[in-house]
Amino acid sequence: MNLALTGVLLPFGDSGVRLWAKLGGFIQDGGAHKFVWHSRGDGASKFCLLCKNLFDQESEIVDEDGSNLLSCDVLKWDELVQASSNDLRKTARYLERKVVTEPPAAFLLLQQSLGMTYHKHALLLNRYLDDYVSPVEVYLHDWMHAIFVDGVFNFTLYLLLESVIRIGFADVYEVFSSYIANWKWPHRVQGANLHGIFAGDREKKHRAANHIKCQASDGLSLVGVASLFVRKVLLNLQRRGLTEGDCSAECYAFLALAEVVELIVASSRIPLPPKTLLTAVEKFLQLFKTAWGCCWMTPKFHWLLHLHDQLRKLGNLLNCFCLERKHRVPKRYATDIANVSKKNSKSLLMEVTSHHLGQLSQHDAFAFEVGLVRGSKASKRTQQVLIAELELGPEAAATIKHSIESRFSPLATCHKGDVILYKDDAGFRAGKVLIHCEVHGLPISMISPFNLHKFDAPCGHSIWTPVQDQNICIETDQILDTVVYSELPDGKVSVLIPSEFR
């Protein structure tokens, strides 16, 4: 069945609902590429199925099994020769012919050199799919795995800290941990323990592993603060007499990576020209090579060169964050299964399915409009405050609901106590959320506003002064974003500004 032409008829309503589907892509990590497209991945001499002229050179990074990971030294998109879908099918079918004629050892080397593994029922060997599936068009890299899962960020930050230690600043891990501890993240991020990634014996573990070991979400949360630390602290070490050497090349390489990450994140909220992303990626790769050479560039560095093409094809950059979080549900129920039997998998599947059906049956399961999350009737004290602030009549009290959390766009929510940016005339202003409420069904947020003291746009760093005893109420959809902030000793507030608002 070709769903792009015939669709599928679903039995809803009197006449039913017909859905058509066109395959957009497979968002995958490297391991999934091996299962679906039979790529040999990082262990192959030719580690990218999409590039015909890219082969490995031995790296200095040793994997846990003792084998050398591969490095990539092609740093420009224009220097790559792109493979076609027909090229991939020819390779798969060439292996199909050779498997019956080549000795096992020779066939293994052939697969290694071509970057593809032969499997009897491989997707690329299914002739029926030739007219429906274009592998090159639907082959996608997941930027989350590329950058944050033993990826580009983990290696680059590790190498930067090692460079700082070599020039004489031996306590950089401890100082960085203390610096992170001064910052606060939006409630949804759970950033209170991020400083622990670099504290205590974690330093030894990172250095033994030759990369920073942390969860992908934690790595993403750290990018902004780490960038400011590099700009304000590491780039000034020699000038302040703390080191004899200089590590500016390494610092600028990390900052170039941070720019790439900021562009990727911003692409989900604002239009981003693919060329802009490609330019930033190529700049980072060149600066990384200047700082540390190509020997540390694993295939995930090469993945970055393909991201702009994915943005061009789909108009956005998909990632696996939400898919990875889905692992929590089966883990939650699998932990409680004590009787390992032939039906334990079925039991687990039933538990997970019931869990998801329970979530889907909730009335707000697909509620993405602006408004309160799990709102409830406001207390009398809250009613009195809002009636006074909004100059309402006493009859409005019955319509007032409140919550500590509210959705301000289809993409995000914010909590009471979060520092936010909100629309103010032609620009934006910062403030802290005091309460979220609804009055006559209209979502409203009470804000303690800040006045701008200083804004360093290139750094994305700003200083604000809280306005004392002056709260304002805004419609919740006027909130632009939640931000990372730090409360300074003099009462001012340091705020990191997202790239799209600089």
Placement of each model-derived feature along the sequence:
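Terminal interaction-prone segments of large eukaryotic proteins
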Residues: 178, 182-502
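Charged (Asp/Glu and Lys/Arg) segments that form or flank catalytic channels of large polymer-
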Residues: 2-232
